């Protein structure tokens, strides 16, 4: 018997879904063009929130749907849209989500990609979010400047499964190591898709920009990634290095309360809590470099921020990182160089701190952020200058699983 819309076992998502969604509207992704938006506009594809369903909601054009839905095609051709990624980078995989499109999902899909430098991208007029309409001849003419018919194919024409919970996520891994800036989503011939997730890692052109301006070397927008952590009960450490400011506590890293905390808390002579444990997260920088300034934002964490924190750095080769992942980051203490000593934190506040004196600012490839005893932080920025040293090679090995509540994250 077929699963009902609310039944069925959902398969475990692939590892690449732990990476950032390069196309999300939250990081600046946007729709440049869509052939048709009759029932629901293509902009819904890029929403950060999961799709929703309103059983009795209708518009003047038909059933309200939280996704992109085109009219039933009665002319030659097929529907497609063009997405400008919010973060340019290497794509590791797609999730074409058909949630709630159970009788009108797009039956087939293909995905193409291209890379345009910012100064070489043709000017595409900003489109209006609308329903009940198709692309105008002027819009077709403008988008033709991108020559999207000739873009590289990352996903060939493939059948999609309908939007029941057990089948709504259509995952497509990508092996290309190339940097991409734009996506063309083709549906054959028409229909609906709830969300398009483009998972990958940011990749910055380090030759561009002002060399005298410090950069956030750990941000996901440039390719930074969490490669290990002790606990992520309420929020993944990758959130710490996300784009922009946090939008809520859910957009930060928060651990469970440690069970080894003493019944009665006491301070040492410096006012630091005497507690036996701590929580930590390790990050691979987007580029080896020297950290000069550290920003720690506890915004939204008002009754659950850490008491204190510290930041250490080290330099590792790819092989050494892989060894540390297997050893759950049991790295000898002498390998870590202090970037920020134990520092008291205040709740719901931005802390801007200088890294240790210049003579101690070694080039690092990895940073370890330690909080005591537990709690939540919304953002971590490690600002500095990229080094010409580059020990890391492109990653070829498959990613490894992790335990969300008390595990470690592996090679992203």
Curated annotation (Swiss-Prot):
It comes from the Eukaryota. InterPro entries: Allantoicase, Allantoicase_dom, Galactose-bd-like_sf. One of its GO terms (molecular function) is allantoicase activity. GO terms for biological process: allantoin catabolic process. NCBIfam families: allantoicase. The function of this enzyme is unclear as allantoicase activity is not known to exist in mammals. Belongs to the allantoicase family. This is Probable inactive allantoicase.
